Regions:
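Active-site-facing substrate-recognition patch
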Residues: 2-63
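Residue-level signature of catalytic and energy-coupling elements of molecular machines
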Residues: 30, 67, 89, 159
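Conserved acidic residues
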Residues: 65, 127, 157
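Short Gly/Thr/Asp-enriched flexible loops that form oxyanion-binding sites at enzyme active sites
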Residues: 76-85, 146
Length: 187
């Protein structure tokens, strides 16, 4: 499966991969946790990732009106990308965290459900948005973000991730919206 490889050379990808720490058996046995905190500790790599996201937007001719990101780590990369593109950032949060009137969506998790909210005036009809987050696994959170945006009449033109865990069905769940991930790991 090809993601972004035609845009970035192997040296660039490998230098970025070196900033991700893998922690076996966290938070539970059998999980290989991909820790992004070393990358977050580096201004150089935060800038590099943001510039790579801009390059992907340009390469795909994505011209968004806003960037949307879910709590919590979508709040890291979303505002950085939005600032570089000269557009706004729209936060999607857990229930009760936004101060004004909101719309919400409940979505299923493997063992239970979750709720996300967005201000009801954050997006207007015809707004083009990109959803960004640190990690794509099953796609449930991003699918919920997409549905919230679409409820308000927005068009999700792309999804951006620092890391994608392959083989968990996220690409099928988010189809036909394009997905670009900087780093790909087996689930």
């Amino acid at each position: 499966m090809v993601y972004h490889m035609s845009v970035f050379d192997n040296q660039t990808i490998e230098s970025l991969r070196q900033q991700i720490r893998t922690i076996p058996n966290f938070p539970i046995e059998g999980i290989m946790f991909r820790d992004i905190t070393p990358l977050l500790n580096s201004g150089k790599y935060l800038n590099k990732v943001t510039d790579m996201f801009v390059t992907i937007c340009n390469h795909n001719n994505w011209v968004p009106d806003a960037i949307v990101g879910p709590e919590a780590r979508g709040f890291i990369f979303g505002p950085l990308l939005a600032a570089k593109l000269g557009i706004g950032f729209i936060p999607i949060r857990k229930p009760g965290k936004l101060p004004s009137s909101t719309i919400k969506i409940e979505y299923s998790l493997e063992y239970g459900s979750n709720i996300l909210e967005m201000h009801d005036d954050a997006i207007s009809l015809g707004t083009k948005v990109i959803v960004i987050d640190d990690l794509l696994a099953t796609g449930g959170t991003v699918e919920a973000c997409t549905k919230l945006c679409q409820q308000q009449g927005a068009e999700v033109i792309g999804n951006l991730f620092l890391i994608e865990l392959e083989g968990l069905g996220a690409r099928d769940k988010l189809y036909p919206t394009p997905i670009e991930s900087l780093l790909v790991y087996p689930a």
